[in-house]
């Protein structure tokens, strides 16, 4: 197994491609992704969603990992008022999400059947070194699990957790719209290279609602193949962007990076 790493360290992305880095270039803008890697810009102005996800992930990793997470992130605890000493609202919801997962024996059988947690993987895709971390994997039965916290698992436009994707310019289910098919395709390929075996992919999804819904989704190989095609179609350009060989597209007009760096061009003043 590859050496341990800080998966969220942006410097690591200059050495190995990470799914999060790759998706930032596709979904959040090229200029934004480069600035995020350089540490001069944070694509996500609020880290609460990431912290909620990590709160849940650490719980299913081990009791020790969960306690360490809480200790390392005192900001999730209220420091004033009547709620002082209690979890903040978002993390109270996260506890409900955890309990909802634990209440389903089928989900828990799948999770408990994958004993290796936070399993580091690496490999090469078309000559580019990749690295990732699996939430849980069963190496003998050849499947791995990824936990996803989502806004909703209700059907919208006939799609599970359906939402509009600016990148695809259409409604997609939550798995496609967030680029998770790209992430899981890369993980499956790295595992194949490490073990010589084909692994099935399961998503344990839970909604961030006062009454959370939890479910299991087995990802079809056709969906994963689509993710791999998107990697191969975009990877060379992304690598050239990181190496400074290609010029990034201008920051998206709705991004905070654009708003903070935009300057009026006197030769092209807008007309109303």
Predicted ranges, named:
Residues 44-45, 83-86, 159-178, 220-222:
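Short histidine-centered catalytic/ligand-binding loop motif
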Residues 70, 154-158, 199-204:
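Short acidic alpha-helical/loop segments enriched in Asp/Glu that coordinate divalent cations
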Residues 107-111, 138-146, 191-199:
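Secondary-structure boundary elements
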């Amino acid at each position: 197994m590859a050496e341990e790493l800080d998966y969220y360290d942006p410097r690591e992305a200059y050495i190995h491609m990470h799914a999060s880095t790759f998706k930032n270039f596709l979904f959040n803008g090229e200029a934004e992704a480069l600035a995020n890697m350089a540490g001069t810009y944070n694509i996500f102005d609020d880290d609460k969603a990431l912290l909620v996800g990590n709160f849940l992930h650490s719980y299913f990793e081990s009791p020790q990992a969960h306690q360490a997470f809480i200790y390392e992130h005192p900001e999730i605890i209220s420091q004033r008022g009547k709620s002082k000493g209690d979890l903040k609202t978002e993390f109270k919801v996260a506890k409900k999400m955890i309990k909802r997962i634990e209440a389903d024996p089928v989900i828990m059988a799948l999770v408990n059947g994958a004993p290796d947690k936070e399993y580091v993987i690496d490999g090469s895709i078309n000559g580019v070194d990749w690295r990732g971390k699996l939430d849980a994997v069963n190496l003998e039965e050849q499947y791995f699990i990824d936990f996803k916290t989502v806004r909703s698992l209700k059907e919208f436009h006939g799609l599970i957790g359906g939402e509009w994707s600016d990148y695809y310019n259409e409604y997609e289910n939550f798995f496609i719209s967030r680029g998770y098919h790209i992430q899981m395709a890369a993980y499956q390929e790295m595992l194949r290279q490490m073990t010589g075996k084909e692994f099935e992919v399961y998503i344990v999804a839970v909604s961030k609602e006062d009454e959370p819904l939890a479910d299991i989704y087995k990802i079809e190989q056709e969906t994963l193949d689509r993710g791999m095609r998107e990697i191969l179609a975009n990877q060379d350009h992304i690598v050239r962007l990181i190496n400074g060989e290609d010029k990034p597209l201008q920051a998206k007009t709705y991004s905070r990076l654009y708003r903070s760096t935009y300057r009026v061009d006197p030769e092209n003043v807008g007309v109303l």
